[in-house]
Amino acid sequence: MASVFKIHSAYQPAGDQVKAIQNIADSFQKGEKKVTLVGVTGSGKTFTMAQVIQNLGLPTLVLSHNKTLAAQLFREFKEFFPENAVEYFVSYYDYYQPEAYVPSSDTFIEKDSSINEEIDKLRLRATSSLLEREDVVIVSSVSCIYGLGSPEEYTNSVVALKVGDTIERDTVIRKLLHIQYNRNDLDFSRGNFRVRGDSIEIYPAYHTDGIRIEFFGDEIDSISRINPVTAQTIFKLEKAYIYPAKHFITSGPKVKEAVENIRAEVDAQTDFFRKNNKLLEAERILSRTNYDMEMLQEMGYCNGIENYSRHLTGRKPGERPACLIDYFQGEFLLIVDESHVTIPQIGGMFAGDRARKQTLVDFGFRLPSALDNRPLNFQEFETLTPRTLYVSATPAEYEIEKSSKVVEQIIRPTGLLDPIVDVRPTKNQIEDLLVEIRKRIDAGERVLVTTLTKKMSEDLTDYYEEIGLKVAYLHSEVETLDRVGIIRDLRKGIYDVLIGINLLREGLDIPEVSLVAILDADKEGFLRNYKSLIQTIGRAARNVNGTAILYADKTTDSMAKAIEETKRRRKIQEDHNLKFGITPLTIKKEVGDIIEREEKERTSEDLVLEDVEKKFNSKKFPNKEVLKEKLREEMMKAAKELDFERAAILRDKMLSIQTEDSSAKN
């Protein structure tokens, strides 16, 4: 039977990929539940994953341990499966301060957050795709184990409309309001709808196009997909399914029942506090909960509504909440990327969440039922994901022990060797590194530098900036979409050097990087253990000139083991290349936005950039010297007119051309 997935790629499986794909697919088809793929950096693990997905033909959840790598995988899978639904599901918070109480200082910290609308749209699109089709690949962070609205409520709330259906216009309006759409006849934006005579125009919360429903009396006369900006018809539809604008949907009767149960719980908790002479806590929980219940009854919503999710969804005490995994219908495949990091992260989520909320419960800020608004614990996660492929260059003991088969993928189809590892003393490491960076810049290549502390990263970035290097600092406070933008800018040559702490290890795919520098490599610990060193060294394995410099005054056991393993893998690849006459080549990969941003959400900078690309390109100016001069003139003109944003973009364009020239010369 033909697979519902179809890979689009100019390449065929090669090297160890052929055997790995066959072994993994055969294992799952025989009924085996857990398999581990041990694949070195640059061996094409993502391509192997895609081939396994195509062979099995199952909906797939790809789990990554951070948003940056999830975004990279999302882009790669979209390229492999352009005809299928590839979706992205990560936390939609740009900023999140959870509710907390610090007893030692009697400080209550209110929840504060900022939601990224683009990621919210992608999350909603992910769940709608799971309910609509079978050919779905969802790339997710650990957000997939956190509470989400019930899939049953979500499915039951879908508004199904078909040409020829008899239904009153006002009934459709009421249904849209129930699934959290807002009527706004002036602002036609995501999650809103407007009414124009005998038609309703809806802007789905998960889509880039709008939908127009036209009525003739009480009958649906036509349904169209429309451009939300111009309102012009794109094409006609026979039917349309409008999915809720929010994941948390609750019917009126359930709210009434939930309020009764919450009031019963608050009475019991108040009695408990009073019996234990905790009068302040008793008054606190009573007043806070009463206020929330009034809001819930009047508005259907209250701040911190997620803390009442157990009652609103009718779950029993201790019962796990619904999550993204529950939206998969029937059999599916879970792929855990960089499993040696992702698996421990899943295990740690529950304990951290529980500790914070227990304090809130103990001091009367939340009811005990708030503890059930939580991520899955590890046992629940294992139960929900029976068919799992673990993928890592350095799998942990857990993955190896759980797997019925461990498949190695050492040989790279490109012939690329593992990087040369050079150990140097820490004395004058910054100046020594500067010399190496300049060599790479002259060759048109890029550099990653990893430090031990945030302060050292910041100081090093400032120092290199002062002496004229194009350098960026990648850290945890950079927003998700900006983080992937920095990586794109490094690849394009806007930056030559990227400095970070622990964000430069697993999975970062930058073929232009020929040097990875690890400062203080002999400081044994989480960031300098064997697995971390192997992963960091591997960042230079996608370039034919790949080198890793470890600055250290002694060789630790972790360093010795990592260097030995790198040499072993290098020898295997060298022998393969010699046997088949393969010449190593740097991976060629198109530079593009990892996550496409929508037309309406482009910033002024995007528009200026588009204008510059349109007016100043190699087609209009084939001679690069003429193009650079035109860019310089336009840059000076923009600066004179105080349009510094345009001037900066023109400067970056000019620098990018200069970088291309120096690369070509070398």
Swiss-Prot record:
Motif (Beta-hairpin) on chain: 92-115
Domain Helicase C-terminal as annotated: residue spans: 429-591
One GO CC term on file: excinuclease repair complex
The entry's keywords: ATP-binding, Cytoplasm, DNA damage, DNA excision, DNA repair, Excision nuclease, Nucleotide-binding, SOS response
Domain UVR: start-end pairs: 625-660
Gene3D superfamilies listed in its UniProt record: P-loop containing nucleotide triphosphate hydrolases (3.40.50.300), UVR domain (4.10.860.10)
Stretches assigned to the Helicase ATP-binding domain: 26-414
GO annotation, biological process: nucleotide-excision repair, DNA damage recognition; SOS response
Example GO molecular function: ATP binding
Domain of life of the source: Bacteria
Residues that hold ATP according to the record: G39, V40, T41, G42, S43, G44, K45, T46
Keyword DNA repair: yes
UniProt record similarity statement: Belongs to the UvrB family.
Function (record text): The UvrABC repair system catalyzes the recognition and processing of DNA lesions. A damage recognition complex composed of 2 UvrA and 2 UvrB subunits scans DNA for abnormalities. Upon binding of the UvrA(2)B(2) complex to a putative damaged site, the DNA wraps around one UvrB monomer. DNA wrap is dependent on ATP binding by UvrB and probably causes local melting of the DNA helix, facilitating insertion of UvrB beta-hairpin between the DNA strands. Then UvrB probes one DNA strand for the presence of a lesion.
Protein name according to UniProt: UvrABC system protein B
Organism field: Leptospira interrogans serogroup Icterohaemorrhagiae serovar Lai (strain 56601)
The organism's taxonomic lineage, starting at the top: Bacteria, Pseudomonadati, Spirochaetota, Spirochaetia, Leptospirales
Gene: uvrB
